[in-house]
Amino acid sequence: MRIDKNLPNYLTIARIMVIPVIILAFYINNSLARKLGALLFVLASITDFFDGYIARKYNLVTSFGKMFDPIADKLLIGCVIIMLLKKDNVDEIPCLLILAREFLVSGLREFLALVKVSVPVSRLAKVKTFLQMFALSILILGSKGSGIIYLDIVGEIILWIAAFLTIITGYSYFKACKKYF
């Protein structure tokens, strides 16, 4: 099977470009718009898996992808967290833990790249990302979009679990940098 050599990069770019549409759908604030926003977020989240999978499987890894895939993830997650904090009654603590870790780890990854140290993404970090995206999907839809009364609580519980894993997985980056402090 022939794959366009830029397909993984197109998926990464699409993930970034859908962010304003997700936010707009959320702010329209009716059930259908919430469902659309949640669906778009889920689709954008799925591209995170496929861009990396396709790039590795078909040897299409690029410098652009290495740089922008994590940026796209952080933009998607960060924008949705900020949106939820501003508009809905979402607990600030797990949101701030996730945002702080993502910014710190981004900086540490840049530093480690400068000193030629690679820290591979662990399986636990992939679980963390999945749980973040799953929780945020639920919270975008929320009780307002689904009619399911306790859906927000389920989303918050999963978000707390994701925040806990966020701290644990961030430790590997700090550990890799320790000898440079």
From Swiss-Prot:
Q: Which domain of life is it from?
A: Bacteria
Q: Which residue ranges run through the membrane?
A: 8-28, 35-55, 64-84, 148-168
Q: Does the keyword Transferase apply?
A: yes
EC code(s) of this entry = 2.7.8.5
This protein's membrane topology, according to the annotation, is:
Multi-pass membrane protein
Q: Which PANTHER family match?
A: CDP-DIACYLGLYCEROL--GLYCEROL-3-PHOSPHATE 3-PHOSPHATIDYLTRANSFERASE 1, CHLOROPLASTIC, CDP-DIACYLGLYCEROL--GLYCEROL-3-PHOSPHATE 3-PHOSPHATIDYLTRANSFERASE-RELATED
> What protein is this chain from?
CDP-diacylglycerol--glycerol-3-phosphate 3-phosphatidyltransferase
UniProt source species:
Rickettsia felis (strain ATCC VR-1525 / URRWXCal2)
Primary gene name: pgsA
